[in-house]
């Protein structure tokens, strides 16, 4: 058998690492406020649908034929 040479990856000295600062994390109360606002918007949308189409909404969930 022939001897196999192993090739080692060579480091590139021309590459430079740039230290990019990360954005500071939002304050916990700001994150909670954003999440709460999203939930509030969704609940408002559901309330609007129920106010305008409550009967149709309920009919969509009525079981038919013993299902």
UniProtKB/Swiss-Prot annotation:
<feature type="modified residue" description="Deamidated glutamine">
    <location>
        <position position="67"/>
    </location>
</feature>
<comment type="subunit">
    <text>Strongly interacts with the proteasome-associated ATPase ARC through a hydrophobic interface; the interacting region of Pup lies in its C-terminal half. There is one Pup binding site per ARC hexamer ring.</text>
</comment>
<protein>
    <recommendedName>
        <fullName>Prokaryotic ubiquitin-like protein Pup</fullName>
    </recommendedName>
</protein>
<comment type="pathway">
    <text>Protein degradation; proteasomal Pup-dependent pathway.</text>
</comment>
<dbReference type="InterPro" id="IPR008515">
    <property type="entry name" value="Ubiquitin-like_Pup"/>
</dbReference>
<dbReference type="GO" id="GO:0070490">
    <property type="term" value="P:protein pupylation"/>
</dbReference>
<dbReference type="Pfam" id="PF05639">
    <property type="entry name" value="Pup"/>
</dbReference>
<dbReference type="GO" id="GO:0070628">
    <property type="term" value="F:proteasome binding"/>
</dbReference>
<keyword id="KW-0175">Coiled coil</keyword>
<feature type="cross-link" description="Isoglutamyl lysine isopeptide (Gln-Lys) (interchain with K-? in acceptor proteins)">
    <location>
        <position position="67"/>
    </location>
</feature>
<feature type="coiled-coil region">
    <location>
        <begin position="29"/>
        <end position="49"/>
    </location>
</feature>
<feature type="compositionally biased region" description="Low complexity">
    <location>
        <begin position="28"/>
        <end position="37"/>
    </location>
</feature>
<feature type="compositionally biased region" description="Polar residues">
    <location>
        <begin position="1"/>
        <end position="11"/>
    </location>
</feature>
<dbReference type="GO" id="GO:0010498">
    <property type="term" value="P:proteasomal protein catabolic process"/>
</dbReference>
<keyword id="KW-1017">Isopeptide bond</keyword>
<comment type="function">
    <text>Protein modifier that is covalently attached to lysine residues of substrate proteins, thereby targeting them for proteasomal degradation. The tagging system is termed pupylation.</text>
</comment>
<dbReference type="GO" id="GO:0031386">
    <property type="term" value="F:protein tag activity"/>
</dbReference>
<dbReference type="GO" id="GO:0019941">
    <property type="term" value="P:modification-dependent protein catabolic process"/>
</dbReference>
<feature type="region of interest" description="ARC ATPase binding">
    <location>
        <begin position="25"/>
        <end position="61"/>
    </location>
</feature>
<comment type="similarity">
    <text>Belongs to the prokaryotic ubiquitin-like protein family.</text>
</comment>
<keyword id="KW-0833">Ubl conjugation pathway</keyword>
<feature type="region of interest" description="Disordered">
    <location>
        <begin position="1"/>
        <end position="38"/>
    </location>
</feature>
